[in-house]
Regions:
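Beta-rich carbohydrate-recognition and catalytic domains
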Residues: 1-125, 129-182, 189-215
């Protein structure tokens, strides 16, 4: 028994926390790297645990980058990113499930950057949540804003009424002080403060946060 979970023959990346019906069910990105073959393919994997010592793996068969999972009216929604090489371009993707084990991708919900507000390459890591203030869904994500300066790293923003059709909005957070996209953003309220958490891969790899009295 090990205190820390480690996948067999693979590396673990970008844990996506989730809690459902009394059970912790974090997802992670499984990457086989040198061990990749027909039987070992990269994918999102869900772990189930009640004590954070004993884990059961559930392969979702979803292939893609970091994202988030929410539950709406009994249906689970997964949002994640995928990467196109030629021409280089990233996409946001949507899948649904009734049990967190079997997922159905929705190809028609896939969408790329508008290439007006945001660059098409740095467009990933969607985090979706309900905005009480605006009565709609918000998606924040790692992005680079279009512009002449190189310091265009930001947390982007899209909004939706139905989780299927998204409107492009100006960045949620864009200090214009870093070239890198602000990765794996998370947003939550604690007490009277709203917190935005994200990671940076510039000259120093670090996790940072910003807080505000309003979203």
């Amino acid at each position: 028994m090990s205190l820390y979970f480690r996948p067999e023959k693979a590396v673990l990346g970008d844990v996506i926390p989730y809690y459902d019906n009394g059970v912790f069910k974090p997802f992670y990105l499984r990457n086989y790297r040198a061990n990749r073959d027909e039987q070992h393919q990269d994918s999102w994997v869900m772990l189930s645990t009640t004590d954070h010592i004993h884990y059961t793996e559930h392969d979702t068969k979803i292939v893609g980058g970091t994202g988030s999972v929410i539950k709406v009216d009994g249906l689970y929604h997964m949002f994640y990113c995928t990467f196109q090489k030629l021409p280089e371009k990233n996409y946001m993707n949507h899948a649904v499930s009734t049990d967190l084990d079997v997922w159905m991708e929705i190809p028609e919900d896939r969408f790329a950057s508008d290439d007006v507000i945001y660059e098409p390459i740095h467009w990933r890591d969607p985090f979706v949540f309900w905005s009480e203030e605006e009565n709609c869904w918000w998606m924040i994500f790692a992005a680079q804003k279009k512009g002449k300066t190189t310091r265009r790293g930001c947390v982007g923003l899209c909004k939706s009424k139905d989780l299927h059709h998204w409107d492009y909005c100006e960045p949620f957070y864009a200090p214009m002080n870093a070239q890198c996209a602000f990765e794996c953003p998370d947003f939550f309220r604690m007490g009277d403060w709203y917190y935005l958490v994200f990671s940076s891969y510039a000259d120093r790899y670090q996790t940072m946060y910003r807080k505000s009295r309003s979203p």
